[in-house]
Regions:
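Acyl-donor-binding surface of acyltransferase catalytic domains
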Residues: 1, 95-165, 312-320
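Conserved N-terminal entry element of GNAT/NAT acetyltransferase domains
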Residues: 1-15, 155-175, 324-335
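A short beta-loop-alpha structural element at the N-terminal edge
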Residues: 4-31, 168-191
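Conserved GNAT-fold acetyl-CoA-binding loop/helix
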Residues: 26-48, 191-211
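Conserved donor-binding loop and adjoining core beta-sheet/short helix segment
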Residues: 29-107, 228, 233-257
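Conserved acetyl-CoA-binding loop-helix of GNAT-fold acetyltransferases
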Residues: 100-114, 256-259, 265-278, 282, ...
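Active-site/acyl-donor-binding loops of N-acyltransferases
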Residues: 141-160, 274, 278, 283-335
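Flexible, substrate/cofactor-facing loop regions flanked by secondary structure
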Residues: 165-249
Length: 335
């Protein structure tokens, strides 16, 4: 392997970072039909995003250089989230030249992770593209695990199942305020239970409940409620999604999808999906975007059957906090 130079990224590197992302995007277009050539507006948007990283000192990144040529990089933002100091490497924060080994990403991480840990950031989140297996291979080889999948459903492709007649699906209205608030705990309760085990911090639960309390009054949101024998069984929540360099225009977000556990297995999710699919098409959307926890057994098996194709995953590694003192710099480990 070439002896690359690894050094901290600087503002002067931004144009080479953008070139690597554009190259990565070209490769991904081979796998995802909804991905198109980047237009100038998207390139400008991407340029502004990369430039802004260097105006914020919480972003820390390292690049691999072949002399002066940047051939790969990882750049993450150190922040406090959910009571922990974490590093978040966004979709723009990682890229590798197409003819370079995935091993280089592992070496870049070796260098950049030391800088993150120096700042006390022990949870590392990296959003990787799935159109190129090198990213997944590299992070799995660094003890990262898959936490969240992000997917697109192309509405030009037909659904492969039918709605069940016993399920009635309707659009929520302002009279459903208390009902929606009462159903707000469904999805988080799934996340909190086995085998997902996401902590339900009281302040987070309170924030979610307050958010749902008035969501029926939001004209930008569409809520579908499923009922069986006039009893609420589940709901889907849709809203518009702003296009980005990697999200196509005319895309809506399926933000929340939930079914009462005791009513699962009766076709509720499928019926909601069919009605949402048809309704979003009448609103001139061409794609639906959603995401799910990999460890959520119901979500991770159901959404792919609805036509959702993952294009990005959030990979996570959590470093044992004892490393901050249990190391060979500690006085008790000195000879």
């Amino acid at each position: 392997m070439i002896n690359y130079i690894f050094k901290r990224l600087e503002y002067k590197n931004y144009s080479q970072m953008i070139s690597l992302i554009e190259e990565r995007h070209q490769d991904e277009m081979t796998y995802f039909s909804w991905m198109k050539e980047l237009n100038q507006i998207q390139i400008d948007q991407l340029t502004n995003t990369i430039k802004s990283m260097f105006s914020d000192h919480s972003w820390v990144g390292v690049g691999a250089f072949d002399e002066e040529l940047l051939i790969g990089y990882i750049m993450g933002k150190c922040e406090l989230l959910e009571r922990k100091s974490i590093v978040k490497v966004t979709f723009e924060g990682i890229s590798l030249k197409h003819d370079v080994s995935s091993e280089v990403l592992r070496q870049i991480y070796q260098h950049v992770s030391m800088l993150w840990i120096e700042q006390g950031c022990l949870k590392h989140e990296v959003y990787i593209p799935l159109g190129d297996n090198r990213y997944l291979k590299a992070l799995q080889g660094l003890s990262f695990f898959e936490e969240q999948a992000y997917a697109i459903n192309d509405l030009s492709k037909p659904l492969t199942f039918d709605k069940l007649h016993q399920v009635n699906v309707r659009i929520a209205n302002e009279k459903d305020q208390k009902l929606i608030e009462s159903m707000s705990d469904i999805i988080f309760s799934y996340q909190n239970q086995s085998p997902v085990y996401v902590p339900a911090y009281p302040e987070m639960v309170k924030k979610i409940r307050e958010g749902y309390r008035n969501i029926v009054f939001d004209k930008e949101v569409t809520i579908l409620i499923a009922e069986i024998d006039s009893k609420p069984a589940g709901f889907h929540l849709y809203e518009s999604l702003q296009p980005t360099w990697h999200i196509p225009k005319d895309t809506c977000e399926l933000t929340v999808a939930a079914t009462y556990k005791h009513m699962m297995g009766q076709g509720i999710g499928r019926s909601l999906m069919i009605e949402g699919y048809l309704l979003m098409k009448t609103k001139d959307y061409r794609f639906i975007h959603t995401d799910w926890r990999i460890a959520n057994l119901a979500s991770s098996t159901f959404w792919p059957t609805c036509g959702f194709v993952p294009y990005m995953k959030r990979m996570v590694r959590i470093i044992d906090q004892d490393i901050l003192w249990a190391n060979f710099s500690h006085k008790d480990n000195q000879r």
